[in-house]
Amino acid sequence: MMKKYVVEVGGRDLIFEVGRLAQQASGSVLVRYGENAVLATAVISEQKREGIDFLPLTVDYIEKAYAAGRIPGGFFRREMGRPSEKETLTSRLIDRPLRPLFPKGLFNEIQIIATVLSGDLELDPDISALNGAAAALEISPAPFKGPVAAVRVGKVDGRLVVNPTNTELKESTLNLIVAGVPDGLVMVEGGARMATEEEILEALFFAQERLQPILATIRLMGEEVGKTKWPLPEVPDYGDLPERVRELAEARLLAAVTQPEKKARRERVEALLREVLEALGPEAAGREKEVAAIFQDLQRQVVRRYVLKEKRRIDGRGFTDIRPIWGEVGMLSRTHGSAIFTRGETQALAVTTLGTPSDEQRIETLLGETFKSFMLHYNFPPYCVGEARMLRGPSRREIGHGALAERAISPVLPSAEEFPYTIRIVSEVLSSNGSSSMATVCGTSMALMDAGVPVKGAVAGVAMGLIKEGEEVAVLSDILGDEDALGDMDFKVAGTAEGITALQMDIKMTGITREVLAQALAQAREARLHILQEMNKIISQPSPGLKEHAPKIVVIQINPDKIREVIGPGGKIIKQIVAQTGVKIDIEDDGRVHISSPTQKAADEAIRIIRDLTAEAEVGAVYTGKVKKIMDFGAFVEILPNTDGLVHISELAHHRVKSVSDVLKEGDEVTVKVLEIDRQGKIRLSRKALLEPEPKTTPQEPAKKHRVPKKRPS
């Protein structure tokens, strides 16, 4: 029996339908919002997965082409299984607020699939998918500390808006996705146009208020139609093993975890664990994994207690201290721009490549085909954390970190009119000990400046952490990897000196107050300004020109009606220009012509040819052309490529011309002046108008006859 739950969000009905579709799933919900219809299913296996110590949760978001009335491209004309970047990012977006809400010790396979069945071209389905996944889990038997829900927040004309449309987002200064539970936020993802810390804080708590009706609706669904929840996983009974591990390790563990360097810290901790196992002897036989789990939990307690009690961090820094920073630009001579950014033991190499408009990334989405002229690709090779493993394609994490850094940099990029290049940045993480995505932001900013890209300002990023026990709180700036793993929050903030451009927050606990978030944002600003100051010592302004090996791009405007003249039949003319000059030419429908060339000389030659091909005759202008055809009444002269005009026989010379061929022959070069262009585009030319007037010949007067008077007869 189908049951419907409706809640008003942002002036539209958010509808949850239960009991009609996908009844074999552990939980299934059809979510409707605007024209969006998303089927969210959750399935939990009845058997535990053996041999693992993590939650085996998989989340997949799928956009079907039929949802927007489209047929997929490609030879097979069907979705081929490999997720798009948008699908990958949305899958991560759904996963992040859900994963922390599962109980510790749950090792059953859980799969969540959100399928877009109908797509609203003005409302992104990602929010509907996240809410649908949360509702499907709420009514499933899976143990889950929900409900959880999400909204998107924009700011249009100074007013905060819930779930703004795509049209509104174009004008919005904020684009935040906020997920929360009844007593706090658990996830934030988004970008901004130089927002202040107070604006971000206001938007977050505005979102928290707007989440409450959705949370109440999802909770009601669980109460009315939800299946009986499975009992929480049993807490392992380790007997007296935890006490034995504490006796053997606690006193020495603090010295191990407070080693300043990551490698030394890891080696000391691993060595101590081996010593504990040896000391336990037969007690630990067959229970090595249990000992490791107990030891890891003890390590977490020791670190957190040390930070809160000593007001210092495991590498010796204070809460607001930033690790030492150094960097360099221009170390790769053949590239178009490069920079290395190092903060403590985290290091990223960013490389800029400039391309032409034809290098833009073509993307198929529910909205149709779009093109992307700025791409940032983040790579996290195994050696950056001292590991050896097989290399594969980019992981979801790599795609997500690249998207975060791309969002941070985008607001400072020049417009296509100012800088008509396609820009690709690749960030190679060479060493990682916390916040490699924010190191990518810093390195990218420097690499763009090194390449001569006229960015509006430098961008830096920092990751903030939190340790909270009761009323004791420590907000940490520029966190290490261990502080991320053992802490309660990972809050990444990026921006310029003027404001925030991107942020990402994942909270592992609830009940974080406005004051704590305000403190985190304030510390992040101080850290960002410090990092920007250090970056400015390396490079503070974009280079005055492009690198030697960067392509030279010139943009000229032609009459759109003349595009066919440049392309020619079957592309013949444009191919000739490319072969003759060695340039690359891209022509847009509005008549903009992008000419990419290795040298300025070749670009100038291509411009001259295109100008000649697209030039239009002007009344009064003088042209030198070739006689194409001789007629009885005049001569047709080609004054511009594919542009002929008529020189009437009366306009050939000042004197009367009996035959056109007496003055001109086919193939002759002749200079003419445009007298008139009629409504049909016919051109009247004159040769005579450019000739000196012929001198007038005065006819000789005949000699006067003198009459001799006749003699009269006398």
Regions found by a protein language model. Give the residues of each.
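Alpha/propeptide regions of enzymes that mature by internal proteolysis
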Residues: 2-5, 9-12, 26, 54, ...
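Flexible, glycine/charged-enriched surface loops at secondary-structure junctions
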Residues: 104-110, 145-147, 214-232, 263-264, ...
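Conserved phosphate/anionic-ligand binding catalytic regions in large, soluble enzymes, centered on
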Residues: 27-29, 123-141, 329-352, 433-454, ...
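Short, hydrophobic beta-strand segments
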Residues: 114-116, 186-191, 232, 236, ...
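Mobile "lid/hinge" segments at catalytic clefts and subdomain interfaces of large enzymes
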Residues: 141-259, 448-544
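Extended amphipathic alpha-helical scaffolds
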Residues: 1-45, 49, 56, 230-368, ...
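Single-stranded RNA-binding regions, centering on S1/OB-family and related RNA-binding modules
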Residues: 549-553, 560-714
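Glycine-rich, flexible beta-strand/loop modules in the N-terminal catalytic cores of phosphate-handling
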Residues: 25-111, 116-118, 123, 189, ...
